[in-house]
């Protein structure tokens, strides 16, 4: 006959039980506050260093890589499909300059 329907507790379950003392909670809150300040500082410094790429920067290595474009003339880019194999990114543009 079965004594219990529930399984016996294992050592793994007991390992993850944390003490619930006020000292432990205060330490955890202080650590969370410090981590939040560090993350905010890192985020602000990264934001100051970030500048979005210019359109010209997207095509700066096009001649060196010869990575598959169809037409290029000054002030005219038509049916450009550039696959950068080094970074595994895809850039597509269909722009025509005004006449």
Swiss-Prot record:
Q: What induces it?
A: Expression is down-regulated by ralstonins, lipopeptides produced by the plant pathogenic bacteria Ralstonia solanacearum. Expression is positively regulated by the imizoquins cluster-specific transcription regulator imqK.
The pathway is: Secondary metabolite biosynthesis
Function comment: Part of the gene cluster that mediates the biosynthesis of imizoquins A to D, tripeptide-derived alkaloids that serve a protective role against oxidative stress that are essential for normal germination. ImqB is a canonical three-module NRPS that assembles the tripeptide backbone of the imizoquins via condensation of Trp, Tyr, and Leu-derived precursors. N-methylation by imqF and phenol oxidation by imqC, followed by cyclization via the FAD-dependent oxidase imqH carry out the three-step transformation of L-tyrosine into tetrahydroisoquinoline.
Q: What is this protein called?
A: Imizoquin biosynthesis cluster protein A
Task: Give the organism, scientific name.
Answer: Aspergillus flavus (strain ATCC 200026 / FGSC A1120 / IAM 13836 / NRRL 3357 / JCM 12722 / SRRC 167)
Task: List the taxonomic lineage.
Answer: Eukaryota, Fungi, Dikarya, Ascomycota, Pezizomycotina
